[in-house]
Amino acid sequence: MALRTIDALDLAGKRVFIRVDFNVPLDPQGRVTDDARIRAALPTIRHAIQAKAKVILASHLGRPKGKPDDRQKLTLEPAAVRLSELLSQDVILADDCVGDGVKKLVRDLKDGHVLLLENLRFHPEEEKNDEAFARELASLADVWVNDAFGTAHRAHASTAGMARFVKEKAAGFLVQKEVEYLGKALGSPARPFVAIVGGAKVSDKIKVLENLIAKADAICVGGAMAYTFLKAQGVPVGKSLVEEDKLELARQILERAEARKVDLLLPVDHVCGAEPKETAERVVVNDRAIPDGLMGLDIGPKTLDRYRQRIAAAKTVFWNGPMGLFEQKPWSEGTFGVAKAMAASPAVTVVGGGDSAAAVEQAGIVDAMKHVSTGGGASLEFIEGRELPGVKACEE
């Protein structure tokens, strides 16, 4: 099924409901500290404005638990203020996302004007994909557009449910870009195709690794998950984080990679500490084996060099998961080193959301990447080969 996109529709004079992802971080004063997700939705919003649509935006923010101060702490007002600045036009903020007051605001909305509904998750029915709630949202719209890739793996009322009750539906430009880039990187990659996979647990990345073993030429492993693989090979790892119940699974993954002639590279040296703290002494262990009393907290310099060489020779590089505890400076060189190597590469470079996207942002090299995914869980599920409800709902 082909993805129908917003530019294929006539939007003039229509009520266009765009599901965006404005789940942005706020400071204690309630100001937006990182507007990347708002900026990512601008091409779709601007297209709808220029097409003279009545633009209705909807998003969630945080995880409201029905507490009295939720409405104050998790209001979308800061997002409305920032969006208004970015668009250089007024953005009306509704005090709810359903109800008579919202219906009146939609009725009064002029062509080319923008209304932002209040936090969808103030209603528990949103995450339950409640049919009555989905129908109520759908009653506000002639056209439904999904431009929230970050929640595309969730079958919620606004991300999938309401699409059944709206005549016209489409993907926004951000969802289109995500599906095209991730699909191309994994479906028909230019070779050599190198994957960099990190993070704490093998169990979190089983499906990702299985899918990549079927497609990649080489997989470079970092992060705490590497110690489970090393221990599975009989290498001492000191007091590093290991998933003891996943050692057999790690062996099977290594065997599968070998059988398919995929180079699965593990660290050959490590940056270690006695504990995972910024104040711990930084010890470079120039060997695969980690001594007792130390834990691996980052890949070592030799390993980083090996991974850099693989990145430099690749035509496609996909990265998901940090190489170490990069949030703390002593253990950040491996992660930032990989990020910089990817930025310097002429290859198609795709960063698969979550912590790796945060690392690229911190390194200040987002623009050097061909694609940085806005979806953490969504990009992982896409890579695992799963169907995303929020994408399927946009198909013709």
UniProtKB/Swiss-Prot annotation:
Enzyme Commission number, as recorded: 2.7.2.3
Its gene is pgk
A GO term, aspect molecular function: ATP binding
Reaction(s) catalysed by this chain, per the record, are: (2R)-3-phosphoglycerate + ATP = (2R)-3-phospho-glyceroyl phosphate + ADP
Q: Which PROSITE patterns match?
A: PGLYCERATE_KINASE
Localisation:
Cytoplasm
An example Gene Ontology biological process: glycolytic process
Question: What are the protein's UniProt keywords?
Answer: ATP-binding, Cytoplasm, Glycolysis, Kinase, Nucleotide-binding, Transferase
- Name of protein: Phosphoglycerate kinase
A cellular-component GO term for this protein: cytosol
Species for this entry: Anaeromyxobacter sp. (strain K)
Assembly with partners or alone: Monomer.
Q: Which InterPro entries match?
A: Phosphoglycerate_kinase, Phosphoglycerate_kinase_CS, Phosphoglycerate_kinase_N, Phosphoglycerate_kinase_sf
Principal location class? cytoplasm
Binding residue positions for substrate: 21-23, 37, 60-63, 121, 154
**Matching Pfam families:** PGK
- Please state the pathway this protein functions in, per its UniProt record: Carbohydrate degradation; glycolysis; pyruvate from D-glyceraldehyde 3-phosphate: step 2/5
Give the residues the record marks as binding ATP: 205, 296, 327, 353-356
**Please, which domain of life does this record's source organism belong to?**
Bacteria
> Which family is it part of?
Belongs to the phosphoglycerate kinase family.
